[in-house]
Structures are given as C-alpha cells and as structure tokens.
Amino acid sequence: MKKMGAEVISEPQRTPDGSYAFFLKDPNGNLFQIVEGTGWFGNTGHPSQCGGVAGVIIGVSDLDKSLHLYRDVLKYETEVYDEQASFEDFYGVPGGGEVCRRVRLIHTEARKGPFAKLLGPTSIELVQTTERLEVKKIFQDRFWGDWGFIHLCFDVQGMDALKIQCEEKGFPFTVDSSNTFDMGEAGGRFSYIEDADGTLIEFVETHKVPVMKKLGWYINLKNQPHGKFLPKWMLKAMAFNRVKS
C-alpha cells in the first residue's frame, strides 16, 4: 500500500483479540483500519490484496447504554472483547494514546438476504474514551454530501417488521420513504434511526438493481423470498457495472 501512495499512519499491531491491524488515510483524510479478513467472496486480483468493508468503529459516550442498540437490536450479539486500557494498535490515530474502553461485537449467525454472500460477515467496535470529556460528535457542522463518511447502512429485508421492532426497543424511524424510492437505475425503500448519541444508521431494502446495464438486465427483488441468496454468478456479473477511472 505504501508503494501505491497510501498514507499509512501506523504499523501492524495486535488488537485485543490477537489479530493484526493498522491504519491509513485516504486523500481526504478519512481513516481506514486494515484488518485480517475472515470472510471472502472472491479474489479480485488487486495488488493491495484488500477486500471490502468488514465493519466499523463507532465512538460512544456511554458504552453500556449503546449496547442496547448494537447488540440487542442489530443482533451483533457476541462480544469478542471488552477491555479498557491504552491500546498500541490505536497509537497512530489522533487521541489513540488515551485510555479508552473497547467492545468488539460480531454476529454468530450468518446473515441472510440477496446480497449476504457478497457483503460477508461484519463486526462493530464501540469505543468510549475515559480520559477526555470534551468530545465532538461526528456529524457536528456537517451536511449530507460533505467529504467523508456519512452514516452506517444495512441491507435489510422486511422493513415493516424491522420498523415495529425498532419502535418497541426505543429506536423509532426518524425517516421512512415508505414506498419504493426511485434512484434511476436502482430503487428501494430506505429508513433511518439514531443511536443514543445521534449517530445515523440507515436501513435499505433493495427493490430493483441492475445486473448488467449494457444489456438492460435488471432484477426485481421486491418479491424475493425472505432470506434467499442471489446466485454467486449473478453477484459477480454486477461487477461489470462499476465505473472505471
């Protein structure tokens, strides 16, 4: 990655679960953590040997309170670790030398749905600083479309049932398109909730998606049986839609 011009800001260090990870920045200053992969859809042959998104790190003000959403509602039910210290694998990032509490969550049951095999297993790590009380919310003074990360998004099936579940757990939808939102070549229903600190989480139920646009081949997922996977060959065919620089 260094040979390809990436700004690597830390060397590989062991995380609390014993695996190796390091951090780098993109040209806009966004932080990425590179971790050892546990699930692979296929080999792209890219020289970086990197896969797709495997998870996210989210800062919270009250970790125990935040677990209600991420563990109990979003079903990342297994705690890989729950530790409080100054962690060497964080030393390269701003504020990384401070004492903090970290809880990494994973889902033990494989996800189901049209794109589950492509997206693979994921994890969520919650971090609460215990030394610094003056913290900045990630969306403070930001607008949709600004450079950088916007929100965490989940591909879902059964939006109506999810809406009821979130309301019962105390996380009502703040936005709900209700019907299919037409995005031109694709379409679906989307909604948002907020965690205890106001961090945005989006749910998207895909209704229409292009498989091969040049051939006019689209697939309607609105009546797709719940939990059914799209064939692997079809998911691979979607790669021909990517924009090449």
What do the predicted segments below correspond to?
Residues 21-45:
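Short, structured interface segments
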